[in-house]
């Protein structure tokens, strides 16, 4: 590759993802002398990236869409961007971002570093769509110069199935967490028996929304003063999306408070006593749990791929069984019965874990090293 700075495209299916999860990496690469181009959809966040000094090219990804002609058009659109911008290296994220960048770059002098940030429902379910996802990964991952994984389960799965050679892979601590932006803050002054639980997620059944609501229903009988909040967007385009009418019924019944969606999660974390994500979605490493722990909030999540990596059980948080509302309710009850000092100790352990294992700077350093090695390659 060139001895000068590289022309690097950072690609995902939404500019929202790039702005919220990869902005600091893009800034670091730019500071290293590389020309960084953001490639994603949804123009509002693309404009924010432009305002921060990054080149931005919008490509229309279709979310959960699977119409062949629409998907082919996206690949061709992405290929034009790679060619017109004379891209040396693509850093790709999200399933469609990974696969489509690989297809778009065929025949071009463009290397690719993939980031497998969880496999989601399409990879683990049965049916034609799942088989297609497996086929596309099999055909594209092997061509990548390097593949980062966010958890060891996914890394071993790809290696064992022969999708990628072990020597071209490594594991990252998720997307990491900005420890300065998510600084430790004291828990609210609430006594044992009361508390605010917060679930942060897209409202998909696979994220454990049903289990969370059923746990709230059970807990309100004994602890009527406890509050159960949900923060995140509805996703009508997803097969497993929670219908708006169902959510409105839960709110009307007083089971949960719906907080909508936000670009700034920090004030909601600061108002919560515990953050809950009972997901069985096949996560990478959920960013919401990292941010919660960084702000010293105890965490409850599932003993499932990706989620379990964020918690030291009984120390920084609690693990429950996937798809088990009763077990989730029992873990939430444990938090309700804790003294303020016990909750603070658990939250403090979570912060320490983030500092030791999930600092975003370690993720950025891993990318910087990989880019430097690829730059020196013939």
Residue ranges: model-predicted function:
Residues 186-207, 213-217, 229:
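Conserved donor-binding/catalytic core segment of Leloir-type glycosyltransferases
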Residues 334, 341-357, 363-369:
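A short, well-ordered alpha-helix in the C-terminal region of glycosyltransferases
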Residues 255, 270-284, 297:
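Acidic donor-binding loop of glycosyltransferase active sites
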Residues 57-58, 138-185:
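Donor nucleotide-sugar binding/catalytic pocket of nucleotide-sugar-dependent glycosyltransferases
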Residues 232, 241-262:
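Nucleotide-activated donor-binding/catalytic signature segment of Leloir-type glycosyltransferases, i.e.
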Residues 298-301, 311:
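Short hydrophobic beta-strand element within catalytic cores of glycosyltransferases
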Residues 40-44, 200, 227-242:
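Glycosyltransferase donor-sugar binding loop
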Residues 312-314, 318-325, 334-340:
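Conserved acidic donor-binding segment of nucleotide-sugar-dependent glycosyltransferases
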């Amino acid at each position: 590759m060139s001895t000068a700075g590289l022309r690097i495209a950072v690609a995902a299916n939404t500019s929202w993802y790039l702005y919220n999860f990869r902005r600091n990496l893009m800034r670091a690469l730019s500071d290293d002398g590389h020309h960084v181009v953001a490639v994603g959809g949804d123009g509002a966040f693309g404009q924010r990236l432009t305002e921060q000094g990054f080149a931005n090219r919008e490509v229309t990804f279709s979310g959960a869409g699977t119409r062949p002609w629409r998907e082919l058009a996206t690949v061709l659109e992405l290929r034009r961007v790679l060619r017109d911008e004379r891209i040396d290296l693509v850093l790709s994220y999200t399933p469609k971002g990974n696969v489509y960048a690989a297809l778009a770059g065929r025949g071009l002098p463009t290397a690719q570093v993939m980031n497998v940030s969880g496999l989601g429902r399409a990879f683990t379910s049965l049916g034609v769509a799942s088989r297609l996802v497996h086929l596309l990964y099999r055909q594209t991952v092997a061509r990548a110069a390097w593949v980062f994984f966010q958890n060891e389960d996914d890394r071993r799965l790809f290696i064992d199935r022969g999708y990628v050679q072990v020597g071209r892979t490594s594991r990252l601590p998720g997307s990491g967490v900005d420890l300065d932006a998510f600084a430790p803050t004291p828990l609210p002054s609430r006594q044992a028996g009361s508390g605010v639980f917060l679930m942060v997620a897209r409202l998909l059944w696979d994220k454990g929304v049903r289990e969370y609501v059923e746990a709230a229903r059970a807990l309100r009988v004994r602890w009527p003063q406890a509050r159960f909040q949900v923060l995140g967007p509805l996703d009508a385009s997803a097969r497993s999306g929670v219908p708006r009418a169902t959510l409105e019924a839960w709110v009307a019944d007083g089971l949960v408070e719906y907080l909508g969606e936000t670009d700034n999660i920090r004030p909601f974390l600061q108002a919560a006593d515990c953050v809950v994500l009972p997901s069985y979605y096949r996560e990478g490493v959920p960013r919401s749990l990292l941010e919660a722990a960084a702000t010293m909030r105890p965490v409850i999540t599932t003993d499932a791929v990706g989620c379990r990596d964020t918690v030291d059980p009984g120390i920084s948080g609690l693990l429950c069984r996937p798809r088990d509302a009763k077990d989730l309710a029992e873990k939430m009850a444990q938090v309700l019965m804790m003294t303020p000092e016990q909750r603070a100790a658990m939250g403090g352990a979570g912060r320490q874990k983030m500092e030791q294992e999930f600092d975003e700077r370690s993720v950025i350093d891993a990318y910087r090293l990989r880019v430097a090695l690829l730059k020196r390659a013939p």
